[in-house]
Amino acid sequence: MSGILLSNPVNAIPLMNRIRKIHFVGIGGTGMCGIAEILAHEGYCITGSDIVYSSTTRHLFELGVKIFIGHKYSNINNANVIVVSSAIHPNNPEILAAKQARIPVIKRAEMLSELMRFRHGIAISGTHGKTTTTTMIVNIYTAAGLDPTFINGGIVKSEGVHARLGYSRYLIVEADESDNSFLHLHPMVEVITNIDTDHIHEYQGNFEYLKKAFIDFLHNLPFYGYAIVCIDDPVICEILPKIKRKIITYGFNKNANLHIFNYRQHIEKSSFTVSRFNQTKLQVTLNAPGCHNALNATAAIAVATEEGISDKIILKTMLDFQGTHRRFENLGYYSLNKINDQTGEILLIDDYGHHPAELHATIVAIRTGWPDRRLVMVFQPHRYTRIKELYYDFIDVLSNVDILLILHVYSAGEPPILGADSQSLCHAIREFGKINPTFISNTKMLSGALFRLLRNNDLLLIQGAGTIGEVVRRLIVKND
């Protein structure tokens, strides 16, 4: 398990020594800021632009990264390469300026692949659960003293950052399938948590193209590498016969190489047993609720088992798991008298999930762990295309809460789509007949709705991938 790395692996690429200044367009994005941070720590001159200041841009600024707010031709001055987020339009002035100056413009995954080139890469992908699974693997490797470099899509709470430069050969990354760019990566180990209908517009509206992308990604493994996949997922089972690499399976399915059974949830903890081929069973206590997190944990256990990390370290890490920022994050109890002058308290949980399957998993975990609490959800839909593609799934799953407040769609740069807006979704849920949702048009209206609706013993769930977490935290947490 030796992980000693004696030199900077990027500088081991001779031509990369010619690259000194790297400019990121959309540097505040979760997929961008981690790569920028690692390169800054490796000694590169990093600059970046975004449309707003955020906690991530502030963090990078404190590391010495020059941040520009707004996109202008002059921002790319003297850059050797431009790294772009998938959310950036091709007509962005910085991209146009780079092309005119014949400066290379690359996707973030292409830069990530350069970071991985001389490292032992572990890439975690899948529609749901990849950020939490990445965090778990990072925690286990760190506890084992393997000092990995990591780049995650969310803040690893035990580390307080999205990314960290380690000095071993290990690089643990979240591999984003949303725009097909994960095919730039060539790791030694891959984890596929599941394959579901999301970002289909990026695959010409054809789910078969998304499945083909995962097949190609698995074949990016070298012949001596291996993949860890969840066979509870029917799409993964469908593509497995086409994969010509070593496969290790996990899941509640009895045929899995790592089989989960005896699952129990104890409020916000869970316990379960994992049987492993030719190895002792593990009795796991995980500091996170939900069957979905048991699956995430077992994927991490599979990686650690293959690496030869001791069971003692694995089990201790699961017991002490602190989680990931905004992934079923328990923010604690807040007094109602600071919100609406009533007596009592509410429990506040913040979750990034924005796909119907993720919402379903969160709702089930809450109903199991806190069955006597009224569930009040503040939901901010994310992307018009997602609402359009999964419209009826959203109607079904959102009808399973007690009180529902729906904010405007967080567009992530997309133009509006007729009938895929929050007002239309709200109307459709009301017509479905199980609950009567409220459309929230602004922060003042949200404050008033919370003042009017919250009562003692409620569980308030902040749900969505946009700005909703910061908005509700300001309204609730600042008053406590």
UniProtKB/Swiss-Prot annotation:
GO terms for cellular component: cytoplasm. It comes from the Bacteria. It catalyses: UDP-N-acetyl-alpha-D-muramate + L-alanine + ATP = UDP-N-acetyl-alpha-D-muramoyl-L-alanine + ADP + phosphate + H(+). InterPro entries: Mur-like_cat_sf, Mur_ligase_C, Mur_ligase_C_dom_sf, Mur_ligase_cen, Mur_ligase_N, MurCDEF_pg_biosynth, UDP-N-AcMur_Ala_ligase_MurC. GO terms for molecular function: ATP binding; UDP-N-acetylmuramate-L-alanine ligase activity. ATP binds at G126, T127, H128, G129, K130, T131, T132. Belongs to the MurCDEF family. This is UDP-N-acetylmuramate--L-alanine ligase. It comes from Blochmanniella pennsylvanica (strain BPEN). The gene is murC.
